[in-house]
Regions:
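Acidic/Gly/His-enriched mid-domain segments of enzyme catalytic cores or analogous surface patches
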Residues: 1-81
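Residue-identity detector for threonine
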Residues: 26-28, 38-40, 68, 86, ...
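Short beta-strand segments
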Residues: 58-60, 88, 117-118
């Protein structure tokens, strides 16, 4: 992924059980194959320790649903730390919308769809404006996910805000 973006890493972290050892002259932390944290969680914790604020996670959504869900939960961890995290895959972008944001999340009409998924308890005060399916101060629970597959109105931007709790925002290109 790094080569495709023309990025040279400052730090490489992993156990290299599924990839060969990197051929970069870069600081590398080699992890044991058997450990409590995944490579990605360890890397994010190390970046937090080093003072990073914004996190772009690429290549963390794939064939293994367990790893994908674990990586999505990293976004919750980052939000709890007051940091910003985004996951990007071939089709979508994911981020957390929470009461910590302090302002509405803006979604432009370049996205085909967007969904709000509750992945952590009851979320209250959910407001969606500028979308095909608006909401005003609604409640979304894990059991009732009615924020799936919404659309930004043509020529508009949608705004999403949360009064209490956290939602996963998935913007589909």
């Amino acid at each position: 992924h790094m080569d495709g973006f023309g990025v040279e890493p400052d730090l490489i972290v992993g156990d290299f059980d599924s990839y060969s050892y990197p051929e970069y002259d870069t600081e590398t932390i080699v992890l044991p194959c058997e450990k409590d944290d995944t490579d990605t969680v360890f890397a994010v914790k190390e970046a937090l320790r080093r003072g990073f604020e914004d996190f772009l996670l690429i290549g963390v959504v794939g064939e293994r649903l367990d790893h994908t869900l674990g990586n999505v939960s990293i976004l919750l961890m980052l939000d709890s730390e007051g940091k910003v995290g985004t996951i990007i895959d071939d089709y979508s972008e994911m981020e957390i919308v929470s009461d910590r944001c302090g302002k509405p999340c803006i979604i432009d009409d370049s996205y085909v769809y967007f969904s709000l998924i509750n992945i952590s308890g009851t979320v209250r005060g959910v407001t969606i404006r500028g979308a095909k399916y608006p909401l005003e101060a609604a409640e979304i629970t894990c059991e009732y996910q009615y924020g799936v597959s919404n659309e930004v109105l043509p020529g508009c931007t949608a705004e999403v805000s949360v009064g209490e709790g956290k939602l996963l925002l998935i913007k589909v290109r």
